[in-house]
Amino acid sequence: MEATAEAAPCVDTLGNGVITPVHNGQAGSPHVRVNWKVEGTNISITYGRPFLKGRIVGDTVEPLEDSVWRLGADEATTFSTSGDLMVGTTHVPAGTYTLWTLTSDATTRLIINAETGQWGTAYDQFRDVGRTTMTVGILATPANQLTLSIENSELRFEWGAMVASVPIMVH
């Protein structure tokens, strides 16, 4: 279900993106589309924003060790760009993709995948455009709700005490 005309966009304080509500997910996670303009290139991410609700990232909620995660709730998170990008070490041509993460051996990788339109657990590694290592840190104030943003030339996500980022630039 698409957002109604009454759903006014608001400014995302993490990266100056514009957030538009899309729908409420099956388990109550709101779904949003966030749009940014980076050096003339339009970038949007549509994803479910789950709440922790007392759960612990890596223990009782994704991302779990050695498990591919859809980087959101419900449907697979989509990432669209109107121009070619470099996301970490991965060249991403203009188009629409899905975003996933894989954490193993204390390394978190962002996966950019060419398959779109699937439910969030239907991941096909043979459709990967690329995988790139993310820089991981600890937030001073944990994020109770998953947030994806683009700021300071980085694509980042905040979830629980974790913040992970990867450089992003127009190519």
Region roles according to the model:
Residues 1-68, 116-171:
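Primarily secretory-pathway and cell-envelope proteins
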Residues 67-118:
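Mid-length scaffold segments of soluble, non-membrane domains
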